[in-house]
Amino acid sequence: MKRAYNFNAGPSAMPLEVLLEAQEEFLNYKNTGMSIIEMSHRSNEYAALHAETKKLLRELMEIPEDYEIMFIQGGGSTQFLMTAANFHTKKYAAYVNTGVWAKKAMAEGKFYGEVYEAASSADKNHSYIPQEFTLRPDTSYVHLTANNTIYGTEYKDFPKFDVPVICDMSSDILSRKVNVKDFDLIYAGAQKNLGPAGVVIVIVKKSFLATAREDLPTMLKYSTFANNDSLYNTPPVFAIYMVNKTLHWIKKQGGVNAIAKNNAAKAKLIYDVIDNSDGFYKGHAAPEARSNMNITFNLATPEMEKDFVAKGKAAGFIGIGGHRLVGGCRASAYNAVPLEACKALAEFMEEYMKENK
């Protein structure tokens, strides 16, 4: 079976090894005579899977014991709401505006109080990561977006603040090593580097969690999930099962450092073509802010970009069109995208340039 070169921005490529394992045991999970999707979330088999998934995540990310790990439904967009609902307890909440997803988070924050931009990269169409920040007194938290899928930028070093830091890591979690202790809350939708859509990983410092509001509907309170081991209601069992498989795969590759090394090599293949194209391909992100996850670039005209995407699709490259809001082209090289796929795309880009220069 020939597999597509999958550069979709999310849901995105998953390790073939993981898919094959899931296929093999789909009808009979651990000799129970049942599929994992048929089993009670109160069963011993699922309880073991649930606990192991948290343990693997804690090990791979080096999450300290004073941090809670939760599995929540609703996607990253619901986290825009939940973070503000629980923690916007002072006069202001601050957001660093590095693109569409940061702005969406900020829009949800407005439902719970005043918000403001601590910094913004909008002046240059979000092609860089701000380095200077202004915080007002009485600020509840600062919200960061670690990686910007649409514009192809990411923080190389995270800034330090004197207020709690909340970070959306949906598109780069486990792609590189981060110091969890630098954050009070991290959230990440699974559908880019962790598994399929359907579950969000939330990592929160217990002392920060203790400051959350409790006068909220049950399913909007983080304490509901923390106090019930994310089992207050039926969790997204299959999504968590696939996250478990993916975490095992990451560990087998050598852990986060090995994954990060491979990701840097993959991105370099494509950025090198862009940089050596004499302007045929124009990278959107400033070199010092380039994402290893989402490589964004433009060609001379929108018509040429459409032709590039169409010919790329015919050659087996899926998902290389830019986001509908900004156009252009984008290759999303998440953890599970193999090096061979990036080599093939780089070769296709070279060939297309020769034919159209």
Predicted regions and their residues:
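Active-site C-terminal subdomain of aminotransferase-like
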Residues: 15, 190-271, 286, 355-357
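Conserved PLP-binding catalytic core of the aspartate aminotransferase-like
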Residues: 281-312
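Conserved active-site segment immediately N-terminal to the catalytic lysine
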Residues: 166, 180-191, 200
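Active-site phosphate-binding strand-loop segment of PLP-dependent enzymes
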Residues: 10, 109, 121-173
